[in-house]
């Protein structure tokens, strides 16, 4: 017998073709699984290397456990709802038509029944598990909560109940209600599909089993709804639906009682459902449900509305007074404003001779270097190589210099791989050769050189200065704000150095090589780790390069802020990490906050809105995330070592209950602040973002009287930054300052207030001045007594003290200042306004603003040329702050500024005064000669830059500065003559170019 011819193509069997699809699926699953494993295992290696494996384990265990619980609860509820409905299906129908329909439905469903009965619960379980896993922090806080020792004014519950119990209980209740609803719908649909529920002409037929199932599900839903109503009573103190946060008159007298009534009513209706399940009659539960809905609408919605509209609104100021008082007190407590020192400050506007004598120390420390503008000067003078860079905004700190505290503008010289030339842009160069920056650069905040350059305290390569040298501190910067994504470092003993370390000299002195010797990252010396990291970073070069050896480490997650965020996911991290030389190392200091949005009666704040200012809007610092909080504490100070990336977390506010709860969750990762060295203590600052949030609240909450608060006639605003063109808030400023009640200056963070801005306009006069003490001392593990103290100076409401915007307008509109600035613009140069500082000295408020000159060349940088000062209606304008203050205060301010050593040139006449007469012909000749000198200096300077002659460029900048000073002096003499002539070639514009401030 002959076999039938096969229809398959020759050489291809059905088995091979049928096995291809499952093989591809298995391969795809294996690839995805291995990629997932690579990401998980590299995370394990990273946390282990840093000594924070406990964080990884506990966080992920919490996520996994909450996911599994959520998944299991939803899966079980939906699965058993479907299974019970299926098993209780009727075996026969009462009539032929119903039987035929039932058989047809069952025939269609039977092929997929098992898949649906398992797949549907799994699908809903995955959604539920994911939702539960996202609440892992609430779960951990609930099981590890710590008491506040303070009760809310309505229910007399400890604050911890609202911050750590209620959020979790609310989630659990809502989650269980969702499960009941989904399971109930799944059960009802199954009953319908299998005939237990049928739509008939006489009504709806429901089998006895379906009735019991629905009744039990309904009872469970109503019980959970009743619990939710009961918990809603407590959430009224967290409400933000009214004009003020918290439970107000209507909430206390209408909403809270109504919620209690609805909770009891829901429980009673649940009992009716249980009775219906037993006796099989549905009239009572249907009536009860209808009554519950009507009660919820009338008592829960209409009644509170009537109370609010017809009782509260006509007498709001009296009825809400008690609750406004609660809001004021609880808000101030939640934001750390309850212990602020408030002093009346009757500021004078009269600049009298010797007025600064009592503020001599403050005057000597007034900062002139603007950390926003001076970055390019650091780059031109200290960058040395194109593969180095400085941040756009530098940081302000303080160091001990010659036995005195010196305000300092500081930055680290970080690596910039994008600065490599095109033929250097190889994988080896970017990840193995060029791995780190080098050195700290710091300049005195209150001084500058004769030609307007920063006066450096620490500079050069090799690094040298008052902060140490290459042997006294580790200058290499492997971890920074602009470090490469990853670098491969390390080598066996005796292997040649491969890393580019630093230039051997300033000009063409070659390069030195180095090998990283610390413990900075996971080892990639074995093939498994190399493969896993190649997958993580999607780089075959990492796997195949001969630059990777048995001792190689991989450095990544190198940004200090992001590093701390990953190791402490329960913290909100400040937007500005700053470097400091501490105990022979460069350390990044990062502030961490514990926050909550559940503090009773506290006014919520959007963190992003509160922390936006002219620095964040320009991208110089990072604004906080767009999340709402109504409680914040600077609970943690973190340090990140710039060399090896090691991280230390210190419990700075060790009395914060939220931090205590997290310490119970992660008991070994947060150290007590008693372990902080004295050197580290001396560089701790009051954090900027916390200060911004607090000053935003103080605009209203400096008022503590409920009646005045209600009237809102004494609200303040943070002034806009007058040195930028956009309408954005002025940033706070770090400076050494002696407040009126202090015996000596302290490093402080400051801001000012003007009347409330209404519809975009406000009177720009000063109403308040806020300072936060940032002096933590220099003793190991001991905080300075005054650290964190907030001091607020309140000016009288009839004050005539100008605000920052008004002071800037005075500078811009003064004729003498305008003419001088026009002269500075000669020769294609820009005039840049530095930060406008406000200081409470001399019995009033002093404004100080440095004025920088920058030529328009690509390689130019700003040099400080003049200083503007204002006190009341008077202004001063001179080459140095010391001279400007003497002009302002009748020839003698009574104090010596930090730049007094730069004096020696003939001071220009103060604005508004008449210089001694001089012949116009001589003045015109002098002016022309000075302008010619300035133009020649600019041309010669640009030629020097083109040749790479930085020393020659610096010399020409000095000549330019001297020539412009001569020109200004000549112009002043011309203006004093009876018939002044036009300034040759003067630029008509008189307004200084706006620039960002710090």
Curated annotation (Swiss-Prot):
Positions of disulphide bridges: none
Compositional bias (Basic and acidic residues): 496-509
Membrane topology: Multi-pass membrane protein
Transmembrane segments: 18-38, 64-84, 115-135, 168-188, 211-231, 260-280, 287-307
Segments of skewed composition (Low complexity): 976-990
Span list, region Disordered: 490-518, 888-923, 971-998
Gene Ontology annotations for the cellular component aspect, listed alphabetically: extracellular region; plasma membrane
PANTHER family: UPF0182 PROTEIN SLL1060 (PTHR39344:SF1)
Name this polypeptide is given: UPF0182 protein AAur_2732
Organism: Paenarthrobacter aurescens (strain TC1)
């Amino acid at each position: 017998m002959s076999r039938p011819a096969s229809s398959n193509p020759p050489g291809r069997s059905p088995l091979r073709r049928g096995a291809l699809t499952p093989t591809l699926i298995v391969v795809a699953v294996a690839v995805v699984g291995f990629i997932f494993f690579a990401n998980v295992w590299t995370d394990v290696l990273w946390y282990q290397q840093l000594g924070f494996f406990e964080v990884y384990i506990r966080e992920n265990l919490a996520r996994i456990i909450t996911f599994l619980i959520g998944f299991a609860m939803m899966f079980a509820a939906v699965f058993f709802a479907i299974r019970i409905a299926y098993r209780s299906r009727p075996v026969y129908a009462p009539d032929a038509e119903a039987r035929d329909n039932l058989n047809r439905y069952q025939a269609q469903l039977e092929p997929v029944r098992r898949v649906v009965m398992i797949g549907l619960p799994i699908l809903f379980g995955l959604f539920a598990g994911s939702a539960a896993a996202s609440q892992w922090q609430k779960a951990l806080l609930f099981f590890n909560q710590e008491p506040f020792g303070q009760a809310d004014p309505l229910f007399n519950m400890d604050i911890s109940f609202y911050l750590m119990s209620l959020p979790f209980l609310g989630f659990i209740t809502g989650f269980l209600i969702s499960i009941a609803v989904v399971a109930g719908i799944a059960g009802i649909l199954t009953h319908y599909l299998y005939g237990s529920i049928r739509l008939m002409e006489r009504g709806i037929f429901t089998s006895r089993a379906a009735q019991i199932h629905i009744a039990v599900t309904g009872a469970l839903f109503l019980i959970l709804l009743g619990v939710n109503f009961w918990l809603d009573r407590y959430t009224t103190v967290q409400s933000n639906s009214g004009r003020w946060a918290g439970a107000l008159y209507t909430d206390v007298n209408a909403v809270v009682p109504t919620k209690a009534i609805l909770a009891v009513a829901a429980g009673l209706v649940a009992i009716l459902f249980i009775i219906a399940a037993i006796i099989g009659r549905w009239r009572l539960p249907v009536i009860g449900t209808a009554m519950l809905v009507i009660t919820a609408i009338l008592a829960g919605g209409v009644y509170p509305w009537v109370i609010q509209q017809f009782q509260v609104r006509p007498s709001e100021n009296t009825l809400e007074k008690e609750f406004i008082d609660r809001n004021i007190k609880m808000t101030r407590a939640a934001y750390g404003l309850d212990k602020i020192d408030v002093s009346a400050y009757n500021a004078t506007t009269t600049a009298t001779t010797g007025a600064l004598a009592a503020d001599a120390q403050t005057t000597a420390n007034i900062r002139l270097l603007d950390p926003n503008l001076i970055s390019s000067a650091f780059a031109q003078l200290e960058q040395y190589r194109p593969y180095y860079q400085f941040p756009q905004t530098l940081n302000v700190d303080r160091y001990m210099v010659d036995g005195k505290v010196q305000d300092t503008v500081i930055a680290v010289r970080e690596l910039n791989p994008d600065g490599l030339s095109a033929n250097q842009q190889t994988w080896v160069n970017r990840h193995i050769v060029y791995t780190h920056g080098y050195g700290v650069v710091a300049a005195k905040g209150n001084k500058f050189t004769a030609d307007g350059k920063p006066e450096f305290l620490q500079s050069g390569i090799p690094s040298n200065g008052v902060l140490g040298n290459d042997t006294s501190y580790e200058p290499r910067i492997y971890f920074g704000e602009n470090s490469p994504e990853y670098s491969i470092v390390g080598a066996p003993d005796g292997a040649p150095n491969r890393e580019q370390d630093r230039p051997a000299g300033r000009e063409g002195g070659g390069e030195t090589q180095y090998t990283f010797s610390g413990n900075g990252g996971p080892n990639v010396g074995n093939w498994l780790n190399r493969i896993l990291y190649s997958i993580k970073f999607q780089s075959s070069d990492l796997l195949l390069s001969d630059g990777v050896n048995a001792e190689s480490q991989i450095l990544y997650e190198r940004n200090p802020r992001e590093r701390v965020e990953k190791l402490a996911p329960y913290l909100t991290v400040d937007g500005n990490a700053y470097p400091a030389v501490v105990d022979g190392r460069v350390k990044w200091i990062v502030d961490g906050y514990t926050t909550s949005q559940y503090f009773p009666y506290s006014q919520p704040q959007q963190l992003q809105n509160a922390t936006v200012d002219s620095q964040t809007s320009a991208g110089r610092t990072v604004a906080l995330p767009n999340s709402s909080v109504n409680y914040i504490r600077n609970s943690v100070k973190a340090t990140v070592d710039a060399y090896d990336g090691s991280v230390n977390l210190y419990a700075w506010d060790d009395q914060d209950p939220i931090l205590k709860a997290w310490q119970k969750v992660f008991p070994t990762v947060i150290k007590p602040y008693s372990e902080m060295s004295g050197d580290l203590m001396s560089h701790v600052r009051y954090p900027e973002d916390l200060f911004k949030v607090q000053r935003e609240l103080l605009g209203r909450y400096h008022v503590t009287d409920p009646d005045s608060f209600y009237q809102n006639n004494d609200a303040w605003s943070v002034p806009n930054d007058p040195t930028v063109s956009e309408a954005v808030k002025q940033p706070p400023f770090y400076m050494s300052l002696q407040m009126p009640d202090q015996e000596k200056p302290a490093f402080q963070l400051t801001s000012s207030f003007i009347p409330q801005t209404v519809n975009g306009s406000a009177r720009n006069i000063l109403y308040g001045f806020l300072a936060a003490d940032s002096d933590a001392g220099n003793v190991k593990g001991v905080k300075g007594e005054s650290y964190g103290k907030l001091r607020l100076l309140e000016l009288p409401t009839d004050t005539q003290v100008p605000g920052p915007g008004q002071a800037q307008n005075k500078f811009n509109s003064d004729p003498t200042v305008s003419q001088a600035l026009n002269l500075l613009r000669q020769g294609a140069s820009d005039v840049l306004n530095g930060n406008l500082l406000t200081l409470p000295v001399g019995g009033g408020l002093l404004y100080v603003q440095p004025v920088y000159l920058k030529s328009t060349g690509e390689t130019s940088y700003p040099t400080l040329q003049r200083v503007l000062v204002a006190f009341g209606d008077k202004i001063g304008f001179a080459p140095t702050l010391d001279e400007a203050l003497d002009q302002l205060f009748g020839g003698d301010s009574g104090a010596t500024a930090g730049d007094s050593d730069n004096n020696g040139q003939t001071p220009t006449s103060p604005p508004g005064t008449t210089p001694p007469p001089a012949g116009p012909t001589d003045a015109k000749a002098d002016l022309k000669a000075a302008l010619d000198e300035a133009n020649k200096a600019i041309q010669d300077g640009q030629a020097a830059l083109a040749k790479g002659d930085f020393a020659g460029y610096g010399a020409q900048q000095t000549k330019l500065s001297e020539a412009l000073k001569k020109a200004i002096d000549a112009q002043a003499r011309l203006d004093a003559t009876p018939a002044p002539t036009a300034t040759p070639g003067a630029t008509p514009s008189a307004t200084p170019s706006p620039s960002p401030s710090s």
